[in-house]
């Protein structure tokens, strides 16, 4: 029962669509009709509002950090259940008919909670790749590959 509760709460926290909510409340626009149609921070930046873009990034990271750190210090053996559930909540949010973001910011929050070194490896790899390629999506994919290599 404990596993189901942790998975459900983590999923629900992960499914909070901050990019959608912030652009709807502050810009009166539906982020799903802008740029790539994705609700994540990269697409929110395409609205031209950097504050909302970086707020989305911060909140998408935070929505992973809060439940995972709680689980890490109270139910250590269930941390990966919480991490997977938060990630799935972001990618498949019940509130938006299971069409969410790509999960990159949420993944960063997960990495920092599980092992902060992995979080830094991802961030540094992402920045280096982005400086060369100028593509956020490519940077995210290749930086993710750096994690198992490390």
PLM segments and residue spans:
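Helix-coil boundary and interhelical linker segments in multi-pass alpha-helical membrane proteins
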Residues: 1-6, 65-81, 112-119
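C-terminal ends of transmembrane helices
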Residues: 19-22, 89-99, 126-133
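Interfacial segments of multi-pass membrane proteins
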Residues: 45-48, 71-75, 104-133, 145-150
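Multi-pass membrane catalytic core of lipid/isoprenoid biosynthesis enzymes
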Residues: 46-71, 82-85, 96
